[in-house]
Amino acid sequence: MTRVFVNKPQPLEARFAQERDRVQAAFGKRVREFRTEQELTLEMLAEKADLHENYVGAVERGERNLSLYNVWRLANGLGLSVADLGQDLPARKGKR
């Protein structure tokens, strides 16, 4: 049997970690804004999105780096498209 070695994920450089944190916080803020506009509790959104309420809370606090699948689940739970939910996220600094 041939062994396959996989590199361990390396920590992000500080600038990339800061950028990730900024985007996660902005995304979480949008999720919370849409949820409260619709007068949904965390529990209600979690049920609609088929996610755990603690996970949704962590997303809203900017503590989770979501998969595209979970972004899609949240968008559907809010009755939005992924594009609507991701609109107005911060632009990448210094990139065009």
Where are these regions (language model features)?
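Alpha-helical residues within the helix-turn-helix
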Residues: 36, 47, 76
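N-terminal flexible/basic segments that precede or flank functional cores
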Residues: 1-29, 33, 37-38, 43, ...
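Short secondary-structure capping/turn micro-motifs that flank functional sites
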Residues: 51, 90-93
